[in-house]
């Protein structure tokens, strides 16, 4: 059958590193250990001296990163990686994470495992208010909710947005100032921090 999975599929895998000059390489290795959680696509965002850089694509991690030279542009003190198994949104390049958002005041990378059960209604509400979405993934909804809080301290923006989403989720966000992790109130999605 043409669309049968080749093996074990779970959800997604998310891996982040902060404060290590080999962050992109460590993230790449970490994603190898999580490959069983997602085989549709992979990506890494590196926080470099020149800002955030991203390499991503459809397929297995080994198909997206065919040689270690592809990690060179991502070298910096922090990185965020993701292997995708879609539960919301299509199997298209625009949905491969981490999603990278560049704003006039900052850049934010966002990776997510789980499902937002109110994503459709939130997306409609945000679109009615003028939001423009670049993907069909429910992940992008969180960033639009965060950016509605501009002017508030970063953690207030993040907490306010997280209080608006429902479902089982684990989010990791990378900014120039830190790596932030959040899980749903019931802890349905696995998250290890340390």
Swiss-Prot record:
It catalyses: 5-phospho-beta-D-ribosylamine + L-glutamate + diphosphate = 5-phospho-alpha-D-ribose 1-diphosphate + L-glutamine + H2O. One of its GO terms (molecular function) is amidophosphoribosyltransferase activity. Residues 12-194 form the Glutamine amidotransferase type-2 domain. InterPro entries: GATase_2_dom, Ntn_hydrolases_N. Disulfide bonds: none annotated. It comes from the Bacteria. The active site is at residue 12. Keywords: Glutamine amidotransferase, Glycosyltransferase, Purine biosynthesis, Transferase. Its EC number is 2.4.2.14. Pathway: Purine metabolism; IMP biosynthesis via de novo pathway; N(1)-(5-phospho-D-ribosyl)glycinamide from 5-phospho-alpha-D-ribose 1-diphosphate: step 1/2. GO terms for biological process: 'de novo' IMP biosynthetic process. Residues 1-11 form a propeptide. SUPFAM superfamilies: N-terminal nucleophile aminohydrolases (Ntn hydrolases) (SSF56235). Catalyzes the formation of phosphoribosylamine from phosphoribosylpyrophosphate (PRPP) and glutamine. In the C-terminal section; belongs to the purine/pyrimidine phosphoribosyltransferase family. This is Amidophosphoribosyltransferase. It comes from Lacticaseibacillus casei (Lactobacillus casei).
């Amino acid at each position: 059958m043409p669309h049968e999975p080749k093996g074990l599929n779970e959800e997604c895998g998310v891996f982040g590193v902060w404060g290590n000059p080999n962050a992109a390489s460590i993230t790449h290795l970490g994603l190898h250990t999580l490959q069983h959680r997602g085989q549709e696509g992979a990506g890494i965002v590196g926080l470099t001296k020149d800002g955030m850089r991203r390499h991503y694509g459809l397929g297995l991690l080994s198909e997206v990163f065919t040689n270690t030279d592809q990690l060179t542009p991502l070298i910096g003190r922090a990185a965020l990686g993701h292997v995708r198994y879609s539960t919301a949104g299509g199997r298209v390049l625009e949905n491969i994470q981490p999603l990278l958002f560049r704003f006039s005041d900052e850049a934010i990378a966002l990776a997510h495992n789980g499902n937002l059960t109110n994503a459709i209604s939130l997306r409609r509400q945000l679109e009615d208010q003028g939001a423009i979405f670049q993907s069909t993934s429910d992940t992008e909804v969180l960033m639009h909710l965060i950016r509605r809080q501009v002017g508030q301290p970063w953690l207030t923006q993040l907490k306010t947005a997280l209080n608006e989403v429902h479902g089982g989720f684990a989010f990791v966000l990378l900014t120039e100032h830190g790596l932030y992790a959040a899980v749903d109130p019931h802890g349905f999605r696995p998250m290890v921090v340390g």
